[in-house]
Amino acid sequence: FFTGANPFVLSTEKLKTLAKMVKEYYPFYKTIGCFARITDIIPKSLEELKELRTLGYDGITIGVETGDNEALTFMNKGFLAKDVLEQCRKLDEAGISYNFFYLTGIYGAGRGEVGAKKTAMLFNQLNPKIIESSMLTIYKTSELYQEIQKGNWKEESEIEKLIEL
């Protein structure tokens, strides 16, 4: 598993080079997993993804965070739910399995249940092997913290986050 941010952002050629190095030095490894964003998959063609699959790429963990377009837009993720659907179907067609990262608390106070339902509707149309979750952490240096200070966004309570899950 390649760690460190999202290695799938690399070009197909660089990912192929890395896969060949893995095969050379660790021939007993059957698959190569890594983190990815939906925006890393978009520029890769189906043929490129199929080639990466033959080189061992599988079990890609994608930071989807949510299936709620309003939250995705507010958080400047750079993609919408339709993009998740399109790109994961492309991975399915290429034979690359994937996992999702879901982020509780991303909807803001009073919206967790609605956002969770939208996310479930999206995820139920796809084939993630694993859905992992993490809770939103707000740092004082973040843009989101500034939005809270301006009164534009309110954090979910811990109970809301648990109900959302």
Question: Which residues are covered by each model-predicted region?
Answer:
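Surface-exposed, active-site-proximal loop segments in enzymatic domains
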Residues: 72-75, 142-153
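Short, hinge-like loop/turn segments at secondary-structure boundaries
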Residues: 51-52, 78-79, 117-119, 149-151
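Conserved C-terminal portion of the radical SAM core fold
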Residues: 59, 82-144, 163-165
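Distinct, well-ordered alpha-helical segments
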Residues: 12-19, 42-52
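Short linear capping/connector segments at secondary-structure termini
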Residues: 3-5, 103-106, 147-149
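C-terminal accessory regions of radical SAM enzymes
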Residues: 149-165
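Core AdoMet radical
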Residues: 1-12, 25-43, 57-84, 99, ...
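Acidic (Asp/Glu)-rich catalytic clusters
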Residues: 19-27, 49-56, 89-93
